[in-house]
Amino acid sequence: MKYAFIFFLTTLFYTNPKNTKNETYPPFIVFQLFTSQGCSSCPPADYLLEQVKKNTSNSNVIVMSYHVDYWNRLGWKDPFSKKIYTELQYEYARKFNSSSVYTPQLVVNGNEHFTGSNKSKLKRSLRKYTSENTSNAIALSNIRKKGRLINIDYKIKGDLNDKIVSFALVLEEKTTFVKRGENSNRKIKNSNIVINQVSLPIQDKANGNTSLNIPEIFEVNDNYRIIAFVQKPNLQITGGIQKSL
């Protein structure tokens, strides 16, 4: 089954003629996984996200892991968890008319959500969003890393009305030995872990620069990448890009 999935990803980006359509802006897809090392249902979703990252070379297929903090009470404090990511998940819950949140939850382009370990729905999302026009494109340039400070220049194309642009610093990969809680005595590998994120109103300014800091708990020389995406007020993502440091 694993190899069939890898074959699916490979053929999707190398043989699907829809990817060669002459569009104003290339298709993209952003997978935002809300996960926790304290949740026993999350490792299969973490693994599936890892496979998407590992087996697609297309820079417009973007995966992000947001570690929420509400399962820390079960005995294991997820070292990557932040309250702000729980708050972001509740923003999506309001959009989807839900009064509660769950893990693992996979949000796709801010438009839809499903259980993060659902491979068939993930495949359908890949087919759908990698063949659709997009209203924004982002270019990142002149990325400078000095110590813990990362500076980024950016340029956004397309409709900018009422939109915001977000920049996330993600840790490419980390394996953690979980000592307590539902995943006690397990090694869990997480991919593209969001460790810092800033959001800016675009306000008709297509060009700009911003900066992100590597938090003190992380090593300066670990492998990181920058992810940028544009959103409407309703949280729909209308453009995205990523670059490794």
Locate each region found by the language model.
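Bacterial Sec-dependent N-terminal signal peptides
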Residues: 1-25
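Short N-terminal helix-initiation segments at or just after the protein's N-terminus
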Residues: 8, 13, 46-53, 170-174
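Short, conserved sequence motifs used for protein processing/export or organelle targeting and
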Residues: 79-102, 111-112, 116-245
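Short, internal active-site loops enriched in acidic
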Residues: 4, 69, 111-113
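Ligand-binding face of N-terminal immunoglobulin V-set domains in extracellular IgSF glycoproteins
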Residues: 106
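Active-site-proximal cofactor/substrate-binding loop regions of enzyme domains
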Residues: 17-100
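Charged, low-complexity surface segments at secondary-structure and domain boundaries
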Residues: 74, 109-112
